[in-house]
Amino acid sequence: MKIIYDIDCLLYFLKVERTDLLEDEFDRIVISNKVFNSLNNPSIPDFIKEQLNILVDKEFVKVEEISYNTDTFDIYYELINENKDQILGAGEAASIAIAIKNKGIIAYNNPDAIKDYLEKCDLKCITLEDMLNALFKKGTLSKKEFEELFSKSNNY
């Protein structure tokens, strides 16, 4: 099953320099080209861009393009134009579109913000908290590491 990351979850692991935890948990993750471009914005610190590009180069992170005249683009376009009460950013809409097209799981820190889309499209969502709990239960994280990472998550 594909895990499609929105910017917030991935950015956390990049900021705390613990992408090794993602690599322990998943074979590969997917991000949209919109998320990739946002993370390569000049305002993003170089160490984050470098880590991301290393993960892409070693093919742990797959950047999925949202191209015109594709089913994924049609879904994306519908998402950004459909519900004016619940406006999605380009990265969020792209991540949701890829998850819908691939019947994947979306990694997103605020599922309440996209609840309507999750329900309508029958998508599963995992949060940073879900991931940290799973890593702790598996024994990948000690209690001390879990507590440190969890407390840092409130800052992001």
Describe these PLM feature segments:
Residues 112-156:
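Acidic, PIN/NYN-like endoribonuclease modules and their adjacent C-terminal/linker elements
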Residues 108-109:
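Short beta-strand scaffold positions
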Residues 2-98, 102-104, 115, 147-150:
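Active-site-proximal, substrate-binding regions of enzyme catalytic domains
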